[in-house]
């Protein structure tokens, strides 16, 4: 049986009975652009992956907008070279009167013309990240910033399954998961798959695949993917050059042409081409927690 023919397992907390959702404003739909949301375990390298992917799309001649969806607001700093103000910060300055804002107040130019926005978020333990994402998209539409955009990338906070996690899925065509060749990262990926599968019952989003990041090998990632019917669509090795690029506040496309960096750039370009050309909508069957331990646990 094809993985696409499997019925996803019944999940507690899925859309429907007992599920509290941040509902999409119909006027805030993103139309015309291809939209990708990037997920993964906290600290796995989502921002590095998102920024270099945005840069790769721009090198292919695409008009790109990256939206950081984390209160840390560091998603785009390798594109812009700085920590830019968040939408929430800017709204506070005008006492939450968005009509007083100009696009240049919250949209910043990054490497090779990539447009950069940091949605920000409420202080820890307060507010709703989903509301912040929704307001950011609404502002972008009001200022016509989405009309001349080919690709939108949402870089989403950690592996928290809440309104902030779900809001980008309301806009995305495909969800991409950043993982590594270790138990904790794959365990988080399994839970993210379950959450995205639940959301895809009501939204158009489908899973595109995963990126093995900061990993010398991919054997455990591949074993998991083979088991659940998922795909690894890129591999970014564990290179010190990638860490150096982040310390220098630059994308890999701005770093010296070392052989290792050139190879990783090629992988990002290949990933961008794969996503632009379209990926098969995957429907993996996430494993129960006990089965994950049995699959990946030590003998």
UniProtKB/Swiss-Prot annotation:
| Cofactor(s) this protein requires | [4Fe-4S] cluster
Q: Where does [4Fe-4S] cluster bind?
A: 128, 162
Q: Name one GO molecular function term.
A: oxidoreductase activity, acting on iron-sulfur proteins as donors
Described by its record, this protein's role is as follows:
Component of the dark-operative protochlorophyllide reductase (DPOR) that uses Mg-ATP and reduced ferredoxin to reduce ring D of protochlorophyllide (Pchlide) to form chlorophyllide a (Chlide). This reaction is light-independent. The L component serves as a unique electron donor to the NB-component of the complex, and binds Mg-ATP.
Q: Which NCBIfam families match?
A: DPOR_bchL
Assembly and partners are described as: Homodimer. Protochlorophyllide reductase is composed of three subunits; BchL, BchN and BchB.
Question: Under what name is this protein listed?
Answer: Light-independent protochlorophyllide reductase iron-sulfur ATP-binding protein
What organism is listed for this UniProt entry?
Answer: Roseobacter denitrificans (strain ATCC 33942 / OCh 114) (Erythrobacter sp. (strain OCh 114))
